[in-house]
């Protein structure tokens, strides 16, 4: 029996060689492989395959999956493939062909009476996003992040304190303890950064032992060469990451002095970008260093006609500046440069900027990490054309490059890639399911540890799930013991050794970060380019390996108003 490609895609989703458009962007994915078996696909529903004695076996719970996502189109850094995904005990247990081994060939994902099913036909499955630049200013940001497809938050803060409004630091063991206790209340993974601005090690060591997963150096606390050196020295001893927001005013040195203070040690440079802060005007040079793991944040990506206008007021509020003081205004204006903002998009597209975060409520938007990543990718395809690695009628390599920026690369950078960051066997089942037309904008389901935590849902009093008003609502995975069982808090190994879980009465599983020190940019996936960056000190023009990086700001974007009319 033969079936047309169109009819097959309507029934089981796209297969090898089919192309799928991402939302209303100019980006197209092409299915590289199909791990299901033609004629023996599994599908749930009345008159469908997953029934007793057909696609469902007689095997007991220990031999079958707890959950199977059928016929999903996986989009990850390692490939774009069609497959069934099996989940057991909250982890990804298999990627391949699901069904009943007694009646079907090539089955490596067993379905039984103990198995739940999510229909992935015609949908895209991605790993949950990781936002590695979060100001924990208000708890409500968790819901915004989850409903955008982000399942892990890394950053610092204690609420709407003046220090937190500006810096991603949770300072001191007492504050760290309170935030770890608060993390138990949320259906999302969290990890906290301590304050790294000190010239002697004791106060930093205390914070690492209190359970932070890393330390943050921020110019508002004084990012001097001495503080940088001391902080990195502590991090080397404890195998934690250091994130840095460098010295905009160049008071304690220039970008070359800061890079020298790194002493070739691994560091995650926040705001390696156009307007987010750090050495003016040339912090962007840091993305050409082999020991620097660079990221940028979403207020400047993609560069649009409105970007410059909104930035001055945002900056004045976030960094506690006074518009009546000329020096404060000059400080703010020195950070906002059209030329470096435009170059930021291009450096992302080249793979020179490796990660993308939000800078939540501190100039960035926590619910737009994924959205703006794909907007930027589409704009860069329009402005720079198809990448050399993409041959033919698809954008697979560009898509792998951009998805790595908010999944696997922040996971590698912060020592949590053994748990999350990709759709791979053994990792937590932190997964997001999308309709292609809404990809990157509005997820269909968000799973944490194999449990649905949020989804669009209609009127709870309706006779079916779909009647209006349909909006995101917390699901069962967001409540009670399920919440703490399906999520983790990432901490230092030193914190685990100190017994912080018992001391603080924490309910979430604590996972130690590891394998951080000694990382190089070459360890990051699809985003490890090391161009020679030059910034003209007079006109701020940016060149990478001699090529001018300038593109006009966009006036129209994909994934914008048509998706948010209601």
Swiss-Prot record:
**SUPFAM superfamilies, per this entry?**
Composite domain of metallo-dependent hydrolases, Metallo-dependent hydrolases
Residues recorded as bearing N6-carboxylysine in the entry? 216
Q: Which reaction does it catalyse?
A: urea + 2 H2O + H(+) = hydrogencarbonate + 2 NH4(+)
Tell me the InterPro entries matching this sequence.
Amidohydro-rel, Metal-dep_hydrolase_composite, Metal_Hydrolase, Urease_alpha_N_dom, Urease_alpha_subunit, Urease_AS, Urease_asu, Urease_asu_c
* GO terms of molecular function: nickel cation binding; urease activity
Q: Which CDD domains does the UniProt record give? A: Urease_alpha (cd00375)
State the active site: 319 (proton donor)
Residues reported to bind substrate: 218
Any Pfam family matching the protein: Amidohydro_1
Pathway linked to the protein? Nitrogen metabolism; urea degradation; CO(2) and NH(3) from urea (urease route): step 1/1
Enzyme Commission numbers on file: 3.5.1.5
Residue span(s) of domain Urease: 128-566
Going by the UniProt record, its keywords in alphabetical order are: Cytoplasm, Hydrolase, Metal-binding, Nickel
Positions with a binding annotation for Ni(2+) 2: 216, 245, 271
Q: What positions does the entry give for Ni(2+) 1 binding?
A: 133, 135, 216, 359
What compartments host this protein? Cytoplasm
> What the entry says about post-translational processing?
Carboxylation allows a single lysine to coordinate two nickel ions.
Q: How is the cofactor bound?
A: Binds 2 nickel ions per subunit.
Catalytic EC class = hydrolase
Gene3D superfamilies annotated for this entry? Metal-dependent hydrolases, Urease, subunit C, domain 1
**Highest taxon in the source lineage:** Bacteria
Identify the cofactor(s): Ni cation
Q: How does it assemble?
A: Heterotrimer of UreA (gamma), UreB (beta) and UreC (alpha) subunits. Three heterotrimers associate to form the active enzyme.
Q: What family, per the record?
A: Belongs to the metallo-dependent hydrolases superfamily. Urease alpha subunit family.
Name this protein carries in UniProt: Urease subunit alpha
